[in-house]
């Protein structure tokens, strides 16, 4: 059996175990996928300064995110259809995150419901909200997150209009999924995945089915979902949601300094510099290239985090050195989930933590809290 050494090894294992339509859903970008690729490539272009003869015998990777102590500044990002990478996927990922000491974020478009995750997780989690046309549903959803004791509300703003993802079109993947004959054949070639799905009752969007009038089956769910993208979404709408939620608010999907300042003005506690993993506007900036200008624009008024392209602990360190106060991972933990369930997510976190710790040591920096652009080669730090 091949040993797992890095996130790429988990990706290869997940690709073998997860049905093609669901694997492709997680592992693809929009249109030509140029932004999807740039997220990774631009991180890899950032080079470190190797330092020697510095005492790094004791190293500390802990940093707070919204006042919550974390083993490392890495949160599990909200990802739709997580429960289709592995049966009960959201529950398993939340458990792994809680045990490891990092935050977990549940997506509106999750398979397991808010209540499911709350009942099985040993720690509070964050809830991610899509602002859809049905504002009554939004209000009820926010109330449910409050009742589940979610410690923060993450509002995603970059999905007013769905970007086109060619692989999803070819696979017949919609919301909910409509498998093609080819994909049905592929499903039966994944026996472990199928057995897992047969063993759970959670196979639909748990936050929606049973919570929206008239949505009782796959057909009515599909009709409702298609009708709910809200191209008219404005900062006034976000302000109203902010008033409803008394806890911490995170605004996700920021790539422009002007939008970052607007998020500060509505009372955000943190913002996530993100291009939705390269799944929305192809040709947009990579997250890491957008990060410095946004950090400069908001200063210390709000925590600035980043997601997109993070596949290693080295990438986490690059983001922190470029000014981020935290990071989120999506695909990296989904690969672990698809490869091995809860244990696979834990393995992904262990890999990233080990890489982060070792790279700090090789850069002569024992404390992550003190990391800045001085650990990068001059050409990279000039961008800060």
Locate each region found by the language model.
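Glycine-rich active-site/cofactor-binding loop and its immediate structural neighborhood
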Residues: 70-109
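Short, basic, glycine/proline-bearing loop/turn elements
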Residues: 75-81, 124-130, 222-224
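Alpha/beta enzyme core
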Residues: 81, 95, 120, 136-306, ...
């Amino acid at each position: 059996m091949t040993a797992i050494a890095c996130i790429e090894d988990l990706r290869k294992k997940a690709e073998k175990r997860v049905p093609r339509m669901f694997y492709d859903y997680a592992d693809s970008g929009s249109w030509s996928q140029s932004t999807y690729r740039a997220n990774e490539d631009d991180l890899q272009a950032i080079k470190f300064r190797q330092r020697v003869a510095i005492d790094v015998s004791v190293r500390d990777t802990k940093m707070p995110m919204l006042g919550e102590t974390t083993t490392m500044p890495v949160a599990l990002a909200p990802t739709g259809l997580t429960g289709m990478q592995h049966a009960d996927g959201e529950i398993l990922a939340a458990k792994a995150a809680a045990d490891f000491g990092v935050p977990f974020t549940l997506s509106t478009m999750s398979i397991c419901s808010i209540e499911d995750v709350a009942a099985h997780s040993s720690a509070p989690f964050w809830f991610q909200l899509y602002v859809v046309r049905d504002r009554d549903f939004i209000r009820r959803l926010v109330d449910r997150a409050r009742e589940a004791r979610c410690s923060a509300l993450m509002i995603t703003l970059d999905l007013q209009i769905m970007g086109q993802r060619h692989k999803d079109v070819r696979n017949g993947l919609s919301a909910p999924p409509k498998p093609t004959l080819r994909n049905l054949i592929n499903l039966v070639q994944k026996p472990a995945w199928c057995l897992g799905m047969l063993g759970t009752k959670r196979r639909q969007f748990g936050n929606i089915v049973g919570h929206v009038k008239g949505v009782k089956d796959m057909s009515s769910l599909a009709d409702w979902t298609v009708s709910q993208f809200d191209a008219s979404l404005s900062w006034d709408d976000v302000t109203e949601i902010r008033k409803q939620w008394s806890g911490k608010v995170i605004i996700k999907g920021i790539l422009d300094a002007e939008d970052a300042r607007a998020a500060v003005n509505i009372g955000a506690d943190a913002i996530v510099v993100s291009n939705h993993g390269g799944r929305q506007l192809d040709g947009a900036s990579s997250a890491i290239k957008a990060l410095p200008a946004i950090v400069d624009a908001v200063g210390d008024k709000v925590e600035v985090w980043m997601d997109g392209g993070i596949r290693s602990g080295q990438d986490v360190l690059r983001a922190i050195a470029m000014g981020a106060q935290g990071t989120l991972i999506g695909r990296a933990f989904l690969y672990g989930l698809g490869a091995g369930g809860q244990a696979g997510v834990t393995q992904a976190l262990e890999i990233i933590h080990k890489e982060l710790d070792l790279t700090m040591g090789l850069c002569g920096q024992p404390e992550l809290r003190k990391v800045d652009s001085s650990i990068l080669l001059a050409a990279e730090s000039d961008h800060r």
